Amino acid sequence: MKKKIKIFIDGACLGNPGPGGYGVIICGKKLYKEISNGYYLTTNNRMEIMAAIIALESLHDMYNIIINTDSKYLKNGITKWIKVWKNNKWKTNNNKSVKNIDLWIKLEYLSKKHFINWNWIKGHTNNIKHDRCDFLAKISAKNPNAIDKIYQKIKNF
């Protein structure tokens, strides 16, 4: 039987685009881990997806996971839209290129290693762990130390 854990994630951006960050909390039996980082120039949606990627990359075993996010973009993207996008050769229903393809591909790959229940939670409603992720994401956005190379390449920075 796979071990059970809960993951809380959040992304933030000071301006959109602008400096951004993510916050992650992973918790289970005998496990509590916080992860955060900030980027000089990115978007809020990229930070939401990045939070999920970083959380999954930090796991070394297979898990039964509940990922809690306040991003409907992330939840719907990975549970519904990605199938349509792939069938449409990474085009939306309006025939536009899907944004953040690099991150969606990576997230889908990492997600296949676990059984994941993607849970949407309303943000800023006194959920202690999610509020902590929000804090970590905002602090990281205020103190960036990394470059979102793909985003900056797309935007020609």
Curated annotation (Swiss-Prot):
Residues annotated as transmembrane: none
Pfam (any one): RNase_H
Cofactor binding comment, as recorded: Binds 1 Mg(2+) ion per subunit. May bind a second metal ion at a regulatory site, or after substrate binding.
Family matches, as Gene3D superfamilies: Ribonuclease H-like superfamily/Ribonuclease H
Record's subcellular location: Cytoplasm
Positions of Mg(2+) 2 binding: 10, 134
Signal peptide (residue range): none
Substrates-to-products reaction catalysed: Endonucleolytic cleavage to 5'-phosphomonoester
EC number: 3.1.26.4
Binding site for Mg(2+) 1: 10, 48, 70
One Gene Ontology CC term in the entry: cytoplasm
GO molecular function: magnesium ion binding; nucleic acid binding; RNA-DNA hybrid ribonuclease activity
Gene Ontology BP, a term: DNA replication, removal of RNA primer
Record's keyword annotation contains tRNA processing: no
Record keywords: Cytoplasm, Endonuclease, Hydrolase, Magnesium, Metal-binding, Nuclease
UniProt keyword Nucleus present: no
Domain of life: Bacteria
Cofactor(s) listed: Mg(2+)
Domain RNase H type-1 as annotated: residue spans: 1-142
Known function: Endonuclease that specifically degrades the RNA of RNA-DNA hybrids.
Subunit comment: Monomer.
Similarity-based family: Belongs to the RNase H family.
Entry-linked NCBIfam families: PRK00203.1
Protein's name in the database: Ribonuclease H
Native organism: Wigglesworthia glossinidia brevipalpis
